[in-house]
A protein has these predicted regions:
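Bacterial N-terminal signal peptides
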Residues: 12-27
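Hydrophobic/aromatic beta-strand elements that line small-molecule binding cavities or substrate pockets
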Residues: 62-68, 91-95, 116-119, 137-143, ...
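Edge beta-strand at a domain terminus
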Residues: 30, 112-113, 138-169
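N-terminal helix-cap/turn-to-beta initiation motif at the start of protein domains
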Residues: 31-46, 71, 96, 140-143, ...
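Contiguous, well-ordered beta-strand patches that form the walls/edges
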Residues: 82-134
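Short, hydrophobic/aromatic-rich segments at coil-to-beta transitions
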Residues: 42-46, 71-79, 99-105, 121-129, ...
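N-terminal secretory signal peptides that target proteins for export/translocation
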Residues: 1-9
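N-terminal glycine/threonine-rich, aromatic-flanked beta-hairpin/loop signature
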Residues: 57-99
Length: 169
């Protein structure tokens, strides 16, 4: 019968190897993949609200939105269609998050308008300024789970404000 002699340096080597293997299987908190602020927006949303025209009259509005989050939630493609009795909008845009600062471009096909937007993202709230050649507005959006509240203010334009509540479908 053969006897095995394990020397202390062999035990140390085996223990070190086991520790390395076990530690390599544990997640490292500092290196975990973090999702960007747009990650939870993906999907189809719909709802309604109110359009306030420059004349002071109010109209009910119905909207549908589609958000496509990309690049681990740091890029967003969006499409928004809204209609009221006298107002239609077909808005498309792309947004990029960089450390809580948002920039992007937009195009609205009904009025053939285009421009850019920039703003900030803090938690579940986005605040932005939207600009085009003939249009400027302040935009805010708060998302909580499957519900979203959206506000757009554009003093001096034909549509002075839009408020709406959307729900993920």
């Amino acid at each position: 019968m053969k006897t095995w002699h394990i020397v202390p340096s062999s035990i140390a080597f085996i223990a070190t190897a086991v520790c390395v293997i076990v530690l390599s299987l544990l997640p490292l908190p500092g290196y975990a993949t973090q999702q960007g602020p747009f990650a939870d927006l993906s999907g189809d949303w719909s709802g309604g609200g109110t359009v306030t025209l420059s004349s002071g009259s109010n109209e009910k509005i119905r909207c549908r939105a589609t958000y496509d989050s990309q690049a681990a939630g740091n890029n967003l493609k969006l499409a928004l269609r809204c209609a009221s009795d006298s107002y239609n909008v077909d808005f498309r845009g792309t947004a990029i998050n960089s450390g809580g600062n948002m920039t992007g471009n937009w195009f609205e096909s009904t009025n053939q308008a285009a421009g850019e937007f920039f703003g900030s993202i803090k938690g579940n709230r986005i605040d932005a300024r939207i600009e085009g050649q003939t249009f400027a507005a302040f935009f805010s959006m708060t998302t909580q789970g499957n519900r979203q509240s959206v506000s757009l203010r554009s003093p001096g334009s034909r549509v002075s404000s839009i408020t709406m509540a959307l729900t993920r479908r």
